[in-house]
Amino acid sequence: SARMGYMILELNNIDKSFGEKEVLKGVSFTAEGGKAFGLLGRNGAGKTTSIRIIMNVFPASGGEVLLDGKPIDYNKIGLGYLPEERGLYPKKLVIDQLAYFAELKGMGAKEAVRAVDYWLNRLGMTEYRNKRLDTLSKGNQQKIQLITALAHNPHIVILDEPFSGLDPVNAMLLKDVVKEQISQGKIVLFSSHQMAYIEEFCDSIAILSAGRV
């Protein structure tokens, strides 16, 4: 039973095929706002495909994705995504990249810069504001990706292997940030092949294996 006012994301019986290859076979799970949901599975189990369907990158072949019982209106619902493949524009300045993405997600220019500066400060990254992305360490690039996912204050936050490549200090910081997002009532979905993180964080778990839960 969901708590009042929190959103519920449901995948009902999702199938996905690419040509002859069946990747997802009747995948169903429910993720609630204000809780962390973990999607656990080996590489190739269908985690990324499930995420891409939630994000509307491509449609499911069958089944439905619902938010509060209705199809998701992607113009109204903000999604934040930290991909496992960390893609950045190397020659851009940190502030330009981040403000660009926040504006892309519907923020006004001033609002975007304000939000980005808040997050740079929150993650101890203010000194890198006017640096080029390709001058940053891997861990700091990952923090930039996290800001890209969170600056526009999304309703649904999807974190794909968020702790891989982080040193202990940054891992702790990320954990704090994620707990904060959960306490704000957001739907936070973790995807990982590492049980330890999922167990530590998540209130409920779906284990994907060969395209099934």
Regions from the PLM with identified roles:
Residues 63-77:
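Conserved ABC transporter NBD signature motif
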Residues 132-136:
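Conserved ABC ATPase signature
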